[in-house]
Amino acid sequence: MWGFLKSVFCSAWGFCVAYFAPTWHVLTILSILVVADWVTGIFASRKANIDITSRRLTHSVVKWLCYITAILLTFMAEQALTLEFNFYLFAAGYIYGCEILSIFENLAVISDSDVYLRILAVIRGKSKDMAGVKDALNEEMKGK
């Protein structure tokens, strides 16, 4: 009985690995960005004297799992609808953008440099209002 269950499980696992193989590069880049966001977030929290709790770390892991699920579901929908359009790459691009924005926010807190604030201002379309970006960043750090 156990041999049968083991063979079924191994076959199902092999099918999943083969089915999602085209997404490995997207998931690898996503994982690198999430880890970079996590590391810079820890440094930013320490700089802002904010406690690092297991709840916040759990939030990061859940966020990463939700990102992976969103990309894989988009890929599955694309395959099921037989689209010749890589829609999952657009979903991944949006998620990459969110993670890169979060990394820049953390770097702005860590470095106290105007360079990252200017980049954030351009991304958010508020390049003339640097004080507004700094206030929003301070407000976000207080919320964490």
Model feature map: region roles:
Residues 8-17, 70-75:
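Hydrophobic, membrane-inserted alpha-helices
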